[in-house]
């Protein structure tokens, strides 16, 4: 093999290994940031025949059980139960809860599984209807906006 071919082969191999290393690092990073979504029933009973491992990062969504919210008087630590149609899962959270958080409300918590039915959350998101409007905004709109009056032609549209 002449020197020119050796140089080309070296360049091609360097490019190949560089691309392979880049793809490998990307897959590793995506794996580390991937949080699987579970409901409380799926967490306890398993999802597709597989239960998450203790220490695994995950997201869980469900309804906050009425009467289960417990706040620590000394800190921002809160614990509450989350349920869907089956078993309950306890969520432990240290931080300020969203304004829309309340008992009976849907939430999504992101955290780490501590044991089979307990999650140490580092983020809690309150779910709400897409038509949600803060009461202050609704009152202001009632005062300044009159409801639109449609004619029968406008209500029927372009139906021909």
From Swiss-Prot:
Q: Where is it localised?
A: Cell inner membrane
Q: Which residues cross the membrane?
A: 9-29
InterPro entries assigned: CcmE, CcmE-like_sf, NA-bd_OB-fold
The residues that the entry says bind heme are 128, 132
> Which GO terms of the cellular component aspect does the record hold?
plasma membrane
User: According to its record, how does it sit in the membrane?
Assistant: Single-pass type II membrane protein
Q: Which GO terms describe its molecular function?
A: heme binding; metal ion binding
Ribosomal protein as UniProt keyword: no
Cytoplasmic face of the membrane:
1-8
Q: Which GO terms describe its biological process?
A: cytochrome complex assembly
Which keywords does this Swiss-Prot/TrEMBL entry list? Cell inner membrane, Cell membrane, Cytochrome c-type biogenesis, Heme, Iron, Membrane, Metal-binding, Signal-anchor, Transmembrane, Transmembrane helix
Query: According to the UniProt topology, which residue ranges lie Periplasmic?
Result: 30-160
**Record-linked NCBIfam families:** PRK13165.1, PRK13254.1-1, PRK13254.1-3, PRK13254.1-5
State the family it belongs to: Belongs to the CcmE/CycJ family.
Functional description taken from the UniProt entry = Heme chaperone required for the biogenesis of c-type cytochromes. Transiently binds heme delivered by CcmC and transfers the heme to apo-cytochromes in a process facilitated by CcmF and CcmH.
Protein name from the UniProt record: Cytochrome c-type biogenesis protein CcmE
From which organism does this entry originate?
Vibrio atlanticus (strain LGP32) (Vibrio splendidus (strain Mel32))
Q: State which gene encodes it.
A: ccmE
């Amino acid at each position: 093999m002449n020197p020119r071919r050796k140089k080309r082969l070296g360049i091609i191999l360097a490019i190949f290994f560089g691309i392979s290393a880049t793809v490998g690092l990307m897959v590793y990073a995506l794996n580390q940031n991937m949080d699987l979504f579970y409901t409380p029933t799926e967490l306890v009973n398993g999802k597709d025949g597989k239960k998450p491992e203790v220490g695994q990062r995950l997201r869980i969504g469900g309804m906050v059980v009425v009467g289960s919210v417990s706040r620590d008087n000394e800190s921002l630590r809160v614990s509450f139960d989350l349920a869907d149609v089956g078993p309950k899962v306890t969520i432990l959270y240290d931080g300020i809860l969203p304004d829309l958080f309340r008992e009976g409300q849907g939430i999504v918590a992101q955290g780490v599984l501590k044991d089979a039915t307990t999650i140490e959350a580092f983020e809690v998101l309150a779910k709400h209807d897409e038509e949600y409007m803060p009461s202050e905004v609704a009152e202001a709109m009632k005062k300044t906006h009159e409801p639109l009056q449609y004619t029968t032609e406008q209500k029927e549209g372009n139906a021909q």
